[in-house]
Amino acid sequence: VSRRRRRWWIAGAAVAVLLTAAVVVTAIAFPSVAATTCPGCYGLERLEPGVYAEPGLPQDRRRQVSEVVQQANKRVRDFFGGRKSSPDLLVCLSDDCYRRIGGGRERGIAVLNRAVMLSPRGVDPVIASHEMTHVELHARLNGADVPQWFDEGLAVLVSDDPRYLAPTGDRCLLDSRQPLPVTLAEWLRAASADPQMYAKAACQVSRWAGANGGKEGVRTLVGRLSAGQPFPDVFHPPAAPA
């Protein structure tokens, strides 16, 4: 009996060591994943449910973060007619904070489609709602695939980003009849070489939405994708207006 217990103890200890090693490797290799799992471990404090920021922020900066989150949530909720996701937000108002949690030069990023990190340059409703849209879309897709250009173009549309969309009418600032990047790796390469890739993607999505019932049409499209219909069967690029 004692020998059997010893074997179980050794096995349990080995599992504990392996799990600890996995946590350490994740924290070193993927700090953003670790930070979104344990914001407090990276020096962030909870400002409100689901929102974390640097400790000791003055009241006006805390209020700024809260207002940005509220406005961004409203944009996503209004577009989709509700929410199916509730990502944690890690908000940094200093570059040191953003580097510490694994951020780079981006304004913001959705981490594993379950959390959002915002850099000091991304603490505004446009960037926050852009990243929240990625999380919301994938929560509604239930594992269905969409081209990365659609994912990004929809995020621009929902966030109403004036850098890449006109305010009214045919909202395209930059049309492109060329194929757009399909995979995430292709998108990252293309967008780093051409920042206007976002405008090209947003043009396609906004024109499709304009020709297919707007927000309701997009919600219907996402529902059909979630039900298993392939993307090429439900999304047909509209012609440019005459």
Predicted feature residues:
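Beta/coil-rich, acidic/histidine-enriched accessory regions frequently appended to metallopeptidases
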Residues: V1-A35, C41-L44, Y52-G56, E67-Q71, ...
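Sequence contexts marking disulfide-bonded cysteines in secreted/extracellular proteins
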Residues: T37-Y42, L93-Y98, R171-L173
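Acidic/histidine-rich, surface-exposed loop or edge segments in extracytoplasmic proteins
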Residues: L44-R62, N113-A115
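Structural motif
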Residues: L57, L93, S119-R121
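Auxiliary, metal-adjacent structural segments of Zn-dependent hydrolase domains
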Residues: R61-N113
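Short pre-active-site segment immediately N-terminal to the catalytic Zn-binding motif
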Residues: L112-S129, R140-V146
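Acidic/His/Gly-enriched intrinsically disordered linker/tail segments
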Residues: I127, L141-A242
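Short active-site segment of divalent metal-dependent hydrolases/proteases
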Residues: T133, L137
